[in-house]
């Protein structure tokens, strides 16, 4: 679309509510997300909330779920589904203190089945929280200055930032901006305090939501900050990504990338993953006006009729990248500068010990699929609690579901190392390169969207793939593999070298050819297949890779060069 052409506005916020989707009416009539949530929480007859309140509660980081392992049995017994709630914390950049960790641990043991989950967007999730415990959990988070606002819903979600801030002054500066961006973009409604803290409603002089208005964003909107050479946050998967540009170790500004998004629907070919497009560069002091300008374009022009078509990536591909850039610049009042050079060389976490420029040390631990839990042979949750009781630095959740024990003085390292060994937290030293670069979403039994297993299945599948790797001498080679229980892509499977997305119980789509640094989408290799076909395909392709790869060539690059899949140049061609 030509930048001067006025785009079609038949599906955006300019239209009357009755011309748009039902979710828009729900938001508009919710009294800024209040709905009837208080009444739903007070209803002791059911362990659930109403369908409309469940949608509104997403804006407060809460998903209503049920235990699908026993859903059919409860239905046969004519019982209500075993409802519970997932609660996600707002934690920009993934940073928390030992005191906060200890409180999170306590809340998980009291209200969430003795487990805590680290997410792919650098935060914590509590699962299996009962309705009557929601307020207690959220008020417990308030005690440690945390909340769950905008962790889900049609808003900014969690703001990501490359870890580890204390490895350099640049990291610290960018993390501080990411934290400010989260506070800057979070919704302003007083509903959160009224519902969860049981506060009185406060009168406001101006609009309750001066930026979002009554209908908020068309869909989720994700923001992330990357610091080259690390692309650990998968900046190209963000709706709005900022790539830090430094000069002599100091932050100069950011390249601006827009339109990333990895969700799709198998039955809808109009949906596809898309990598963000870099549209220019801004000086650091232009960051917050740029956030407002880009978000406001999506707020005003995003599709509010069809939620499958409502993400920013579709707005960009429909209106045209040139028009979107021009409209952003019009709202900014200045033109973006040309993109600055940068290079990404890694996407995963450097596990183990690293010393920062200030002399402090940091240890990145492998947390398989982000699940912090005690098992008979691995008391991980107890071990991390023991470390938090003596640690004087910070904890940092990584975008790969791992955990960094950060800011350790050299004199304190032996004590931390001893606890790691005592509780088996140093096992990353004996794991395969594939397992250390693996991720899985939660999926069954709690996620209502899952079509197949993910977190509960991937570790066993990896053991079988590791036998193949061992055969070909590839055990230590870093290869990214990501699995999700549905096509929505929470674990970012479409930019993995090996991606698996659930289609039905025991059945998955197999994707190959993603970029090791997160710079390229993969492509479907096999559709709707079970474990035998997956292992056979990986035996063939990995064996070929071991024999014929070029020096330094990653598996995803080889899969394309060898002709197993074609390179996906743009997201809209993903389904071709």
Swiss-Prot record:
One GO term of the biological process aspect: cysteine biosynthetic process
Record pathway: Sulfur metabolism; hydrogen sulfide biosynthesis; hydrogen sulfide from sulfite (NADPH route): step 1/1
EC number(s) recorded for this UniProt protein: 1.8.1.2
Stretch list, region Disordered: 1-26
Family recorded in the similarity comment: Belongs to the nitrite and sulfite reductase 4Fe-4S domain family.
Residue ranges of the TM segments: none
GO MF annotations, alphabetized: 4 iron, 4 sulfur cluster binding; heme binding; metal ion binding; NADP binding; sulfite reductase (ferredoxin) activity; sulfite reductase (NADPH) activity
Cofactor: siroheme; [4Fe-4S] cluster
Catalytic activity, reaction form: hydrogen sulfide + 3 NADP(+) + 3 H2O = sulfite + 3 NADPH + 4 H(+)
Assembly information from the UniProt record: Alpha(8)-beta(8). The alpha component is a flavoprotein, the beta component is a hemoprotein.
SUPFAM superfamilies for the chain: Nitrite and sulphite reductase 4Fe-4S domain-like (SSF56014), Nitrite/Sulfite reductase N-terminal domain-like (SSF55124)
Biased composition, class Basic and acidic residues, residue ranges: 1-12
Binding site for siroheme: 490
Binding locations of [4Fe-4S] cluster: 441, 447, 486, 490
GO cellular component: sulfite reductase complex (NADPH)
Gene3D superfamilies reported in the protein's UniProt record: 3.90.480.20, Sulfite Reductase Hemoprotein, domain 1 (3.30.413.10), Sulfite Reductase Hemoprotein,Domain 2 (3.90.480.10)
Family annotation (HAMAP family): CysI (MF_01540)
Role played: Component of the sulfite reductase complex that catalyzes the 6-electron reduction of sulfite to sulfide. This is one of several activities required for the biosynthesis of L-cysteine from sulfate.
Xref: InterPro entries: CysI, NiRdtase/SiRdtase_haem-b_fer, Nit/Sulf_reduc_fer-like_dom_sf, NO2/SO3_Rdtase_4Fe4S_dom, NO2/SO3_Rdtase_4Fe4S_prot, NO2/SO3_Rdtase_4Fe4S_sf, NO2/SO3_Rdtase_FeS/sirohaem_BS
Cofactor note: Binds 1 siroheme per subunit.
Keywords annotated in UniProt: 4Fe-4S, Amino-acid biosynthesis, Cysteine biosynthesis, Heme, Iron, Iron-sulfur, Metal-binding, NADP, Oxidoreductase
Name this protein carries in UniProt: Sulfite reductase [NADPH] hemoprotein beta-component
